[in-house]
Regions:
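Alpha-helical transmembrane segments and immediately membrane-proximal extracytoplasmic
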Residues: 1-294
Length: 294
């Protein structure tokens, strides 16, 4: 399984090193299976070679930005990393909540896609554009250049993608998360009057790092895609997004082997789905108490 994940990730995005680490990192939080290192590395590299051999090409984004780690940029990266964590958590929570709502519907097998499709069509008509549909490649491309993206863009993309996934349409969440991160990074750069290419590159990998709980793989991916000169800010943004996103994520079967905080305690083999369900029960009891008090 880990080797297959590594091969798929490395070949799809043209990042064989990141693919290998992703396969090692994604199944459980806080634990890396080094006994699977060689199979994952070989699988990812071979998958990438095969894809390139049959003529498949990968899109490259222009993040050619001169970079010097000044105190201003240092604190800006920490701040934007926290924003990336918030976007990761919001996306994961919204997606799981909508999945829960969809599955609770009577005749959900039929109603879920009908309702979800109708909502997406209505939102597309309201937006007046199809730019928020699909993977978001056009939005990613625009995020690396001026003018900077509006802060509303990443929120709208979160809503579109969460509804699509939550109501049963499975078109992938990885590239839309790249889009959400890139547009948020671009918006942050516009707000702080900095280079959008730098923060779009950081958001591209950091939001996914927080949502998938794979900071090492996403750091390496950022280096493979955007260059080693951005290694330090990429690593900072990915780690901050990973830590601050909490025990949330897009992969509900992901186990928690080592909590992100010493203050958090979980039973053995606890998954993110179990954490979400426990959090939801606590929230429901709290709302019930407040309702009874009022």
């Amino acid at each position: 399984l880990m080797t297959g994940i590594a091969a798929g990730f490395g070949s799809v995005f043209g990042t064989p090193l990141a693919g290998a680490i992703f396969g090692l990192e994604v199944l459980s939080i806080g634990r890396i299976r080094y006994d699977a290192l060689i199979p994952c590395l070989v699988g990812s590299i071979v998958g990438d070679i095969v894809c390139r051999g049959v003529g498949i090409t990968h899109h490259h984004y222009d993040a050619a930005v001169s970079f010097t780690l000044t105190p201003t940029i240092f604190f800006s990266v920490l701040l934007v990393g926290a924003l990336f964590a918030g976007a990761s958590a919001l996306f994961a929570e919204m997606t799981h909540a909508l999945q829960h709502v969809g599955k609770s519907l009577r005749y959900s097998t039929y109603l879920r896609p009908m309702i979800g499709g109708a909502i997406v069509i209505a939102l597309t008509l309201i937006a007046g554009s199809q730019i928020y549909n699909g993977l978001g490649l056009e939005l990613i491309e625009k995020s690396f250049s001026l003018p900077a993206q509006s802060p509303s863009v990443f929120l709208i993309k979160i809503i579109f993608t969460a509804i699509t996934l939550g109501f049963g349409f499975k078109g992938g969440e990885v590239t839309p998360l790249f889009c959400i991160g890139a547009t948020l990074g671009s918006a942050f750069a516009g707000f702080t009057n900095q280079d959008p290419a730098l923060y779009a590159a950081l958001g591209f990998v950091a939001v996914f790092a927080g949502a998938a709980n794979t900071p090492l793989a996403c750091t390496i991916m950022g280096i493979e895609l955007f260059g080693s000169h951005l290694a330090v800010p990429i690593a900072m943004a990915c780690v901050v997004a990973y830590i601050l996103s909490g025990h949330r994520g897009i992969y509900s079967s992901q186990r928690i082997d080592q909590p992100k905080s010493y203050a958090s305690k979980f039973d053995e083999d606890t998954t993110l789905k179990g954490v979400w369900e426990r959090r939801n029960r606590i929230r429901s009891r709290y709302l019930a108490v407040r309702k009874s008090d009022s």
